[in-house]
From Swiss-Prot:
It is found in: Cell inner membrane. The chain crosses the membrane at residues 19-39, 62-82, 113-133, 150-170, 177-197, 225-245, 259-279, 291-311, 349-369, 379-399, 406-426, 431-451. GO terms for molecular function: potassium ion transmembrane transporter activity; symporter activity. Its main location: membrane. Keywords: Cell inner membrane, Cell membrane, Ion transport, Membrane, Potassium, Potassium transport, Symport, Transmembrane, Transmembrane helix, Transport. Belongs to the HAK/KUP transporter (TC 2.A.72) family. This is Probable potassium transport system protein Kup. It is a multi-pass membrane protein. Transport of potassium into the cell. Likely operates as a K(+):H(+) symporter. It catalyses: K(+)(in) + H(+)(in) = K(+)(out) + H(+)(out). The gene is kup. GO terms for cellular component: plasma membrane.
Length: 634
């Protein structure tokens, strides 16, 4: 887990308030998405065109499916097992992909599969990040239609006002109001539980749904639509991946405790309470969540629902920022401008390009679907796809890293794979029913990420073709030494055994070398953080030439000047006013050489041209940087 989480948990033995604080924080950040699912899940099941009757057997069968889905997928798979697959405390599909890639290192094809699976999972997460705010806020605002007649036409405008306002404040950060997220969500889950108890008391027979026989009987009595219903019941599981993605903020134990002590009981009670309402009045299936509430509680629940959905949306947006930073560090996404919105919380970041892209996607979804019922058809494909990818990557971890015995690992993996495959298959028909949007968004993002990754590989390969081995270069400098000037020159290069092109261009045009020449390589590790004693490697070649390798984790800011200040060597001088950084800026020219399709080469050239340069990314001083350009055919 993260350092902060580790410290807090380490002292929680004597301070129960610390453990409670972490649990409340986890409720506010991790459980917003799954916590707002009761707003639309049962409504979609009964009015979504699946043909499920709102009668005794239908209600108990659906409730049983939801209950056991929560037990198996969330409780057993994610909370008990997946949360243990942390990458030095960090979670999420990117962190899991990096962990599985290390575990699969001896197997080239398996490693390639892990990389592709990780990219697909990340792409689907971005698609999910657009749908969650749209469907959550829409479903909350729709409660006004129950309270007041004639407000149907105001649902979309009100939802857009809330959502656009949420995206507009991202640049200013949410640290100040973030402290309220946990208490508000605790209040939300308390309200869910209270409403559920209110409904169950009126129809206690709904508690029979905890018997899995009702789920089995439902499939038997609905052979034509049984699997299709899973496409609707999976809405109750949306947000399960967020538990894993946000693990680095709180640690495994607070997230697990919050689930079993508060979130799971509240969700089960509320779903069962909604089922009781439908049993009492089949017409309540049109919006069982709000019709479960007594008349006096309707408007307060609309207000609380709106707050809860905004918090859930905020968590998803922050998750997209965090995932993007990880992807940038791992080399899957072009470098973007990352702003820190809090001086106290390192995880509070803002990425403008991601924020505006998400906002456009969310607005288009709201305008295109206009209601949570319509949007529910688009939900599920991205969610179940990400869940399936997580299971596949977990299979690699179980086999290669945890080294479970075959008699245990194979059956467990097969059961996880079968359940997730069933949910995914149930959602595939949604692609032609409105679910194409997250799929198309995922495909576009996958193409961008894979093109960037492959393009960077080709760029390095092309630069290597004309590179000069470092020992040969140093030997030639001894034979014909150029004029040396005072100071330190740092040349950034991806290769550790060749001369940077910027160094050759500088020597060719300026005919001089600095007293100290440092060839600097930055290595992004598959782990979230790097220990201080592993931050740098230094090798002296003599005649003022040095090789320095800096290591950064995918959750760290690659601050080169800051890291070099820790590099204490008597013979190296990194004084700011005596150090000059030389960078190479490549201009890519698409060609007919073997590598990528011409359109992908053109796309990569566009991405490279618009990506943030090394200067900002590595926090280099503006007045101490010289950029030298070069053209490269790929």
């Amino acid at each position: 887990m993260s350092d902060a989480a580790t410290r807090t948990e380490g002292t929680s033995g004597g301070h129960s308030s610390s453990a409670v604080g972490l649990m409340v924080g986890a409720v506010g950040v991790c459980y917003g998405d799954i916590g707002t699912s009761p707003l639309y899940t049962l409504k979609e099941v009964f009015i979504g065109g699946y043909g499920v009757q709102a009668n005794h057997d239908g209600v108990l069968g659906v409730l049983s499916l939801i209950f056991w889905s929560l037990i198996w997928v969330v409780s057993i798979k994610y909370v008990i097992f997946v949360l243990r697959a942390d990458n030095q405390g960090e979670g999420g599909v990117m962190a899991l992909s990096a962990l599985a890639r290390r575990a699969a290192a001896p197997f080239g094809r398996l490693q390639t599969f892990v990389v592709v699976a990780g990219l697909i999972g990340a792409a689907l997460f971005y698609g999910d990040s657009m749908i969650t705010p749209a469907i959550s806020v829409l479903s909350a605002v729709e409660g006004l239609e129950i309270a007041f007649d004639g407000l149907e036409h105001w649902t979309v405008p009100l939802a857009l006002i809330v959502l656009i306002g949420l995206f507009l404040i991202q640049k200013h950060g949410t640290a100040r109001i973030g402290i309220l997220f946990g208490p508000v969500m605790v209040l939300w889950f308390g309200a869910l539980a209270a409403l559920g108890v209110y409904g169950v008391i009126q129809q206690p027979e709904v508690l029979q749904a905890m018997n899995p026989v009702w789920a089995v009987r439902f499939f038997g009595s609905h052979p034509g639509i049984g699997v299709a219903i899973l496409g609707a019941t999976v809405l109750a599981l949306t947000g399960a991946e967020a538990l894993y993605a946000d693990m680095g903020h709180f640690g495994r134990k607070p997230i697990a405790r919050a689930w079993f002590l508060l979130v799971l009981p509240a969700l089960v009670l509320n779903y069962f309470g909604q089922g009781a309402t439908i049993l009492s009045n089949a017409e309540a299936a049109r919006n069982p969540f709000y019709l479960l509430a007594p008349g006096w509680a309707l408007l307060p629940m609309v207000a609380l629902s709106t707050l809860a959905t905004v918090i859930a949306s905020q968590a998803v947006i922050s998750g997209a920022f965090s995932l993007t930073r990880q992807a940038i560090q791992l080399g899957y996404v072009p470098r973007m401008s990352i702003q820190h919105t809090s001086s106290h919380e390192q995880g509070q970041i803002y990425i403008g390009g991601v924020n505006w892209a998400l906002m456009v996607g969310v607005v288009l979804l709201v305008l295109g679907f206009e209601s949570s019922a319509s949007l529910a058809a688009a939900y599920g494909v991205a969610v179940t796809g990400t869940m399936l990818i997580t299971t596949l990557l977990m299979g690699v971890v179980i086999w290669r890293l945890w080294k479970w015995p075959l008699w245990l690992g194979v059956p467990f993996f097969c059961v996880m794979l079968a359940v997730d495959s069933l949910f995914f298959a149930a959602n595939v028909p949604k692609v032609v029913q409105g679910g194409a949007f997250p799929v198309i968004a995922g495909i576009v993002i996958f193409i961008l990420m894979s093109t960037w990754k492959r393009g960077r590989q080709l760029l390095v390969e092309r630069l290597d073709e004309g590179s000069l081995p470092l020992p040969v270069f140093i030997s030639s400098m001894r034979v014909q030494p150029p004029h040396r000037v005072q100071g330190t020159a740092i040349f950034l290069t991806a290769r550790t055994d060749a001369v940077p092109h910027a160094l050759l261009h500088n020597l060719l045009h300026n005919q001089v070398l600095h007293e100290q020449v440092v060839l600097l390589t930055v290595v992004n590790e598959d782990s979230p953080r790097v220990a201080p004693d592993r931050r740098f490697e230094v090798e002296a070649y003599g005649d003022g030439f040095f090789r320095v390798i800096l290591h950064f984790g995918f959750m760290e800011e690659p601050d080169i000047p800051g890291a070099l200040r820790l590099c204490h060597l008597n013979e190296l001088d990194f004084s700011p006013m005596r150090t000059t950084y030389f960078l190479s800026r490549e201009t890519v020219i698409p060609s007919r050489r073997i590598g990528m399709a011409r359109w992908r080469e053109g796309l990569f050239a566009f991405l490279l041209k618009n990506a943030n340069g090394n200067l900002r990314y590595f926090n280099l001083p503006l007045n101490r940087v010289i950029e030298l350009g070069t053209q490269v055919e790929i």
